[in-house]
Amino acid sequence: KVYQVKGKSFNANQLIQNLIDNTEDKSFINKNIKLDLAIEKIFFDNENAINDLKGELYFRNNELYKGDLKAYFSNDKELKFTVTSNGGTKVTTLFLDEAEPLVKKYKFIKGYKGGSLDLYSSKIGNKSDSTLKIYDFKLKELPVLTKILTLASLQGIADILSGEGIGFDEFEMNFQNQGNKITIEEIYAIGPAISIMMSGYVEKNKVISLRGTLVPATTINKAIGSIPVLGKILVGSKTGEGVFGV
């Protein structure tokens, strides 16, 4: 059965939060249905919205198995969402030219600014393998990371994180999701001031276990700078010079 969903505006704030918290009731889509969507404005919250959402969603047995959505932010930047199913494998992609409205809904992240987001997820049965990439963003407040930096005697960087924020050029997370457990195979984040590599797992509402390496850019510069000739080329003789200048 096909349903036409059209309108001037829709407040998706609570719906998005329920999906993030995995508390959304999907029992209303227990039949095979298709939604044709055409909504002029959808609100993420009181400050952020997307315009001209158009596309199709196909549901079967309480599950979205096919879809193609496209919308625009106020500056004509894009949101794209697709779902395809083939031979028992479901592939989901999400691209946001503006990642901030979505990322800031995660309660453990505060002060997130800027960035674009690219998500790819492949699901077979109840197990999914996913890659999340975020580019060119800034974190102003991340309590767990701030505590780690302070304990590691990197108070200067901790102060920046809780003040003006730390910029990152690229973030990538490769992870598996099965049941209530997320296994993080690798996280890496690269920025002018600091680089991070981690792995671990998260059990919903129970345990977070992460381990890895956190390296300030100044430490990298010192290590490379000690290499004769090559170190001077890569790092430079003055602050901010060379390939690894900060």
Please identify what each model-predicted range represents:
Residues 188-190:
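Short, glycine-rich nucleotide/cofactor-binding loops
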